[in-house]
Swiss-Prot record:
InterPro entries: Ribosomal_eL30, Ribosomal_eL30-like, Ribosomal_eL30-like_sf, Ribosomal_eL30_CS, Ribosomal_eL8/eL30/eS12/Gad45. Gene3D superfamilies: 3.30.1330.30. GO terms for cellular component: cytosolic large ribosomal subunit. It comes from the Archaea. This is Large ribosomal subunit protein eL30. Pfam families: Ribosomal_L7Ae (PF01248). The gene is rpl30e. Belongs to the eukaryotic ribosomal protein eL30 family. GO terms for biological process: translation. GO terms for molecular function: RNA binding; structural constituent of ribosome. It comes from Sulfurisphaera tokodaii (strain DSM 16993 / JCM 10545 / NBRC 100140 / 7) (Sulfolobus tokodaii). Keywords: Ribonucleoprotein, Ribosomal protein.
Length: 106
């Protein structure tokens, strides 16, 4: 059995106790309006969408975590039967993921 990483554990806590949106269109819309606290993107996200998210997130001072796995792996990690290229975090709930990302950026 594979060992669960800190990110995976915190993501599961986030999904259980927080509020998120899935998908690049919804996430970009939420980043533009400043309604998300952070963004998680899969490594396989199309470059044009990645550039848009990074640009809008920089303007809005929203941290972005780049997940090393594919959209399929991120979807599986989230317990979904479909690929997830982006996750917009509206409320982190009991997860420490947002704090860990901010600490890592310093």
């Amino acid at each position: 059995m594979a060992e669960v990483t800190g990110f995976e554990s915190e993501l599961k806590t986030l999904l259980r106790t927080g509020k998120v949106v899935f998908g690049s269109k919804k996430t970009i819309k939420m980043v533009k309006t400043g309604k998300v606290k952070m963004v998680i993107i899969a490594s396989t996200l199309r470059q044009d969408l990645k550039d848009d998210i990074l640009a809008y997130a920089k303007i809005s001072n929203i941290p972005v975590y780049q997940y090393n796995g594919s959209a399929y792996e991120l979807g599986t990690l989230c317990g979904k039967p479909f690929m997830i290229s982006t996750i917009g975090v509206i409320d982190p709930g009991e997860s420490r993921l947002l704090e860990e990302i901010k600490e890592g950026a310093q």
